[in-house]
């Protein structure tokens, strides 16, 4: 699963996820993309589940890019532990998705195959998504 090799600090504050994606909002590498429409955190497990769903559907054809990386540590205290005594340990890693962010890209497959692969990946994700094509300028 995806997670940083090393970080400057082990834990982060929760923060807030405002605004629209100003970076990573265009299809850059492949022909087709899966773009987020709503906001929310996506965990490393969800990113991996979506990647597996895409790869299983396209089989050996096409190339897939993952355009998000979970670099935000999410902490949790153990079950049945009283509050206080400091912040909990890192439980998992997540990526805060903003509307307009491209999550996955694919090339080398037909549009119908890409649509179906992204539909299956979208079922694994906690945000609503839409299918986008690369725009040639």
Swiss-Prot record:
Keywords: Ribonucleoprotein, Ribosomal protein, RNA-binding, rRNA-binding, tRNA-binding. SUPFAM superfamilies: Ribosomal protein L16p/L10e (SSF54686). Gene3D superfamilies: Ribosomal protein L10e/L16 (3.90.1170.10). GO terms for molecular function: rRNA binding; structural constituent of ribosome; tRNA binding. One of its GO terms (biological process) is translation. One of its GO terms (cellular component) is cytosolic large ribosomal subunit. It comes from the Bacteria. Part of the 50S ribosomal subunit. HAMAP family: Ribosomal_uL16. Belongs to the universal ribosomal protein uL16 family. Binds 23S rRNA and is also seen to make contacts with the A and possibly P site tRNAs. This is Large ribosomal subunit protein uL16. The gene is rplP.
């Amino acid at each position: 699963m995806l997670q940083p090799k090393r970080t400057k600090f082990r834990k982060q504050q929760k923060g807030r996820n405002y605004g629209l994606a100003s970076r990573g909002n265009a299809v850059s590498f492949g022909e087709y993309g899966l773009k987020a429409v709503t906001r929310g955190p996506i965990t490393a497990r969800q990113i991996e589940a979506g990647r597996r769903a895409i790869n299983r559907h396209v089989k050996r054809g096409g190339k897939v890019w993952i355009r998000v990386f979970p670099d935000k540590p999410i902490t949790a205290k153990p079950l049945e532990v009283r509050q206080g005594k400091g912040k909990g340990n890192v439980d998992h890693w997540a990526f805060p998705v903003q509307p307009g962010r491209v999550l996955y890209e694919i090339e080398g497959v037909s549009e119908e195959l890409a649509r179906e692969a992204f539909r299956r990946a979208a079922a694994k994700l906690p945000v609503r998504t839409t299918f986008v094509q690369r725009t040639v300028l």
